[in-house]
Design a protein with these regions (language model features):
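Bacterial Sec-dependent N-terminal signal peptides
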Residues: 1-9, 18-50, 54, 228
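Tryptophan-anchored aromatic micro-motifs
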Residues: 51-73
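Generic short beta-strand segments
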Residues: 59-67, 152-159, 193-204
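Short, cysteine-centered beta-strand-loop-beta hairpins and adjacent loop/turn segments enriched
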Residues: 65-73, 101-116, 198-214
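Acidic, glycine-anchored loop motifs typical of Ca2+
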Residues: 71, 75-81
């Protein structure tokens, strides 16, 4: 094989590789953002590059999923509550919106009796709180779709206040979350799964825990797209 043919062959192989990568990175398929795909570890440099591209505002929807019944629960809130803001420089990495209505569904609180002791929590269903995210860490890339990356959520926290008691301090519900998710760098779409791992009722500004909130096994699923 002469030099010209070798050169043409190398060019053809290069274009084939580029084309296959482009095809793999043009998918906009929800199946690429589940946990059935195969993921390969990425370098810290690649993870940092993705992190630096994230700051901005995202909007979409959130629902509660119960793995024991395989049912989804959607909020009846009239407010536009489903958004995520990731900051470039801030003490808290980012904020996810969460409505009281969704929170009640998450913990299935109406069947636990907590609503008898903290009534205000359940009378203002349209009120919102923020899940404060401490950070997310990208760990791997989808081998079937190179646009999709998996990440871990280090920790999140949400508080809902209740001022219905005639006491100097207000009561509140607090839930801690961890979880994981997927991010498509081409479409700027997040899919985030947040699992409560601790929840309790407390008096504001007090460190003593006053009661545990039962964990139901349900978790939050956010599907969000970058808008700015």
């Amino acid at each position: 094989m002469d030099k010209k043919n070798k050169y043409n062959l190398l060019v053809a192989l290069f274009l084939l590789l580029v084309g296959s990568f482009a095809v793999s990175c043009t998918k906009d398929d929800e199946n690429t953002t589940d946990n059935t795909s195969t993921f390969a570890p990425i370098s810290s440099e690649e993870a940092l590059k993705i992190q630096n591209s994230l700051p901005g505002k995202y909007k979409g929807n959130v629902h509660v999923y119960d793995p024991s019944t395989k049912k989804n629960y959607y909020s009846n809130s009239r407010l536009d509550l489903d958004s995520l803001i990731i900051y470039k420089k801030k003490y808290n990495y980012g904020y996810l919106n969460l409505s009281r209505d969704t929170y009640v569904q998450l913990h299935n609180i109406e069947k636990t009796g907590i609503n008898d002791t903290l009534p205000e929590i359940f009378t203002k269903r349209d009120e919102k709180a923020n899940i404060e995210l401490e950070g997310i860490r990208f760990t791997s890339r989808n081998q079937q779709d190179s646009c999709v990356y998996r990440f871990e959520v280090s920790r999140g926290k949400a508080d809902f206040l209740d001022r219905s008691h005639n006491k100097p301090s207000v009561w509140y519900l607090r839930t801690y979350f961890n979880g994981y998710g997927y991010y498509n760098v081409k479409t700027s779409k997040f899919k985030i799964y947040l699992r409560p791992f601790n929840a309790y009722t407390m008096l504001f500004h007090e460190t003593l825990e006053y009661g545990r909130i039962p964990l139901t096994g349900r978790y939050l699923v956010y599907e969000l797209t970058k808008i700015q």
